[in-house]
Amino acid sequence: MEIPETGDMTTDIRPDLERRRQNQQDYVLRTIEERGVRLVRLWFTDVLGRHKSVAISPAELETVLDEGLQFDGSAIDGFSRVQESDVLARPDPSTFELLPWADPSEPSGTIFCDITNLDGTSFEGDPRQVLRRNVDRARAVGFEMFCAPEVEFFYFADSGPVPTTLDRASYFDLTTTDVASDLRKQTLHMLEALSIPVEYSFHEDGPSQHEIDLQYTDALSMADSVMTLRLAVKKIAMDRGVYATFMPKPLNGVQGSGMHTHLSLFRDGENAFHDPAKADG
């Protein structure tokens, strides 16, 4: 089946989308004023999935929400060449959250951005735009895309050249002096404050290896949530003098970390792959 491009399906729903965006934008600006936010961090990723951030003052946010923030894309690996360098970071107001780890005396917020060309077209090097385009193509033929990842990572005592694990535990193990378990608990509280629901977390099979499983949601929101989770895990570990890493194989002879991702397509609120005539569904 040929799936239409995004541009073939937006005409009828564009006014509703613009109205929804304006309502979300108004909510963001009102929240910033009411909560006394002093700094807003604009987040996006490069083509390798590295987290990028630009900080602006609340006074600049309304203009940036309307017009985007222009920056030199050639300074970011894989984005653009010098001769065609300028791109726009356009905040998605639906992703705004207050940062729970910010100094209470100086509240900060964060918002994910789409990267576009100066003419407003999608920038091909922006992973979020690539995902959005494919989500829209699936929606055009009646499908909603959902996913739920199992995020695995290691905690080490420091960031030195020889990794030192915090424990010798294995799958589902728990000890009364489990420092890493406490780090996971703090991370879950942080994710809850960021409106990211967690299904469960536990010690994985390898020493000092852990897993956090997020509750399934739409693919674009989940991509943002995974980026936020990675930052939260590292931030909380760093505050305790511990080093967290998501690299796939940090220890020789020990199973590595992955991110199993459960994908599903729904049509009219029903699982498109469910077959009630089959015993196993």
Predicted feature locations:
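Glycine-rich, acidic/polar active-site loops that bind/position phosphate-bearing ligands
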Residues: 2-281
